Amino acid sequence: MRRSAFIMFTWCGLMFAGAASAASFPCVKAQLRSEKTICQTRSLNDADVKMATTYAIVLHALPMGGRDAEKGMQYQWLKQRNTCGSNTGCLSRSYASRQQHLDDIIQNRVLSHGPF
């Protein structure tokens, strides 16, 4: 129970800290159509911050062996996300899918078993 409360407290803290900034990447350096669309669309911007925060929590909570695999999945997801270009529906679905995957890791691998 303590671990669950700690993770949720950390997640909330990071979420509010990230909410004050724009996307999880510097929008002034956005070059891809997908990045520009994320920066210009509030709901996508919010989804990006939430996903990036959850991803950071997952990486810290996973055992070392699982981190590299998750980093690889994130890289593949970014490649897939970028194929959406400026299609907001595609980007929204991509973020929803990735967020669900990360939420499942927190529920099934971290909270139920712990990081060790």
Predicted regions and their residues:
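Positively charged n-region of N-terminal signal peptides that target proteins for export
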Residues: 1-5
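Bacterial N-terminal signal peptides
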Residues: 7-16
